[in-house]
Amino acid sequence: MLQIIDNTLMALKEPMPSKEELQSFCELLFTIGVDVIELPTIMYRHIEQLPQGRYILNVEYEEEINANPGFYRYVCHQPSCAKNIIHELQLNDIREIIKLRSFENCTELRIKGLDDLICHPYERYMGEWQSHLPDTTINFCPENTFGCATALAFQWGVDYGGNITASFAGCINNAATEELIMALRLAIRHKPNRDLTVLPRLTALYEKFFSMSIPNRKPIIGKNIFKVEAGVHVDGIHKNPATYEAYTPTCVGAKAELVIGKHSGTRAVKWKLEELKLPVTTDYVIDQILHQVRLICTKNRKSLCDEEFILLATEVMRCEGSQIYC
């Protein structure tokens, strides 16, 4: 059965976030559709009380398991035949797949790495894993050197229903949890009723934990992914959002926004004036507004925020003899 394991907490370093923040982060991961959360021993000792759910403890040696009982699974870097232990095997490239033959007796095996698998007949190789290790539960954790980790993880999940290890925003150089969840949701309706509107809260905690900002164009969680500027796109979304949007912005706690910039056209300017409740004036004045928009945006190399557009439109209409009544 397909399971998504999130190992974001494995990347956290000192100083640790508060217990309450970590607990909230775990709860939100479960909310969006993560099945199991992996964490290191030091994190477990810090957080003390784990929220309800299934957890994997990452240990160096099998002896540490006795000191930390009660977990759903344990990840260990030493080979083990125990049913509750996942052995982790690093394969740096496709040539090392031959090593899998040595793990026929493993109950569960995590295959980590294989960055270059996307450059080869990956479907054939994935099928060979299953045939060579018929009694082993395989957990795939592709790394992201070639920018294709999420695609490989998705393919493994869809074709073989296998377990996948990912991290939020792909922070451990592996598949991005949120991208994987959305892709599976759209392709095979995997957990379609999970609540993804909490993603902005999850993103805010992530940014605080790692003292970094998510790129504005990051798929699923970027702040600007639903900002549309180009005229053709604006027209299409205005008529039928499904033309350009695989899912609604509200599905992930966001909203669509029309941005005025150098790629905008007269229709976009008209719709923006209506949206901001400014008078939609003559075509000539709209052309003048658009001309000024393109000059300013080209010079500043960025689109206009609403406040900047209001000032510009007001000034153009004033110069053309129009008047805005508040």
Regions found by a protein language model. Give the residues of each.
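Conserved active-site and cofactor/substrate-binding residues in soluble primary-metabolism enzymes
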Residues: P17-S24, H120-R124, C148-A151, A175, ...
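Gly-rich Lys/Arg/Thr-decorated short loops/hinges at beta-loop-alpha junctions or inter-strand turns
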Residues: I4-T8, E104-I111, V252
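Active-site mouth loops of central-metabolism enzymes
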Residues: L2-S24, N58-E63, R73-E96, I138-C148
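Catalytic alpha/beta core domains of metabolic enzymes, predominantly
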Residues: L114-T243
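Terminal or standalone catalytic/regulatory effector modules within metabolic enzymes
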Residues: L28-R54, N58-E62, P249-C326
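Active-site beta->alpha loop and helix N-cap motifs at the rims of alpha/beta catalytic domains
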Residues: F30-H120
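Active-site pocket-lining/capping segments in soluble small-molecule metabolic enzymes
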Residues: Q3-I5, Y55, E60-E62, A67-N68, ...
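Conserved, mostly hydrophobic/aromatic
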Residues: L12, L29, Y160, L180, ...
